[in-house]
Amino acid sequence: TREEYTRFLLPDKALTRRFYPISIEEPDEELTLSILSGSIPSIEYETKVKNTFSANTTERILRTLISISIPANQPDDQPAKRPELPLTLLEMAFSYAALSGKTALSCEYIEQAVHHSNRLRKEIRTNFTCAL
């Protein structure tokens, strides 16, 4: 982060010659959706769990994960930018399915991922349902 660069690297001349700050804007919702969609095949490969939802249902699920991941729904001390939190929730859902010995992703595991995430406020976690 810029804060870490200023705090740790900038005071050290040798490090400032080797590291340069690069500013990257947070992706918008559409780009985040594209990133998440593009990540599914590698998550499937790693977990051996398949996404068997239709393309439309998958898009609705991903948009839901993106929408609940807004900063207002996160604890004040742990803000995350897109696509970090929705991607983490997606990976957790696949992992819960894999740990349960399942080969297909279901709403149950998406709900588990959200309910067990400490990166969302309690009221978001407890009220979340994967309504398709």
Name every feature range the model reports, one short phrase each.
Residues T1-L132:
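AAA+ P-loop NTPase nucleotide-binding core of proteostasis motors
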